[in-house]
C-alpha cells in the first residue's frame, strides 16, 4: 500500500481498519450489486439504484485520486455501513 499522498491517507487508513477487521467489499457493476461482508456478521447487500450510487461514488473517488486503487476506495466508502453491525 502506498500512502505517499497526504490527501488520500484517510482512505488508506479506513481501508486498513476494514481489512484488519476481516471486512470485504464485493462490487459488480454489471449486475448492480454490492456486498459488504465480515466474519460473524450478516452481509450488507445492496442492489439496483443503491448499489449503482455506491459504485459511482467509489469511481468518483478513484478518478479524483488516481493513485488510490479501486479496492481501497470501495473499502473506505463501505466503512460507514459497518455501523449497522454495532
Regions found by a protein language model. Give the residues of each.
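Short acidic DE-rich linear segments
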Residues: 83-86
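Acidic, low-complexity, intrinsically disordered interaction modules
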Residues: 26-74
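Negatively charged, low-complexity tracts enriched in Asp/Glu with abundant Ser/Thr
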Residues: 1-22, 61-79
Amino acid at each position: 500500500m502506498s500512502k505517499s499522498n497526504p490527501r488520500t491517507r484517510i482512505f488508506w487508513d479506513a481501508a486498513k481498519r476494514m481489512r484488519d477487521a476481516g471486512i470485504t467489499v464485493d462490487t459488480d457493476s454489471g449486475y448492480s450489486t454490492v456486498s459488504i461482508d465480515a466474519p460473524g456478521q450478516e452481509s450488507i447487500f445492496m442492489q439496483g439504484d443503491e448499489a449503482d450510487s455506491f459504485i459511482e461514488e467509489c469511481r468518483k473517488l478513484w478518478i479524483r485520486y488516481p493513485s488510490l486503487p479501486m479496492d481501497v476506495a470501495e473499502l473506505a466508502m463501505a466503512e460507514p455501513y459497518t455501523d449497522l453491525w454495532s
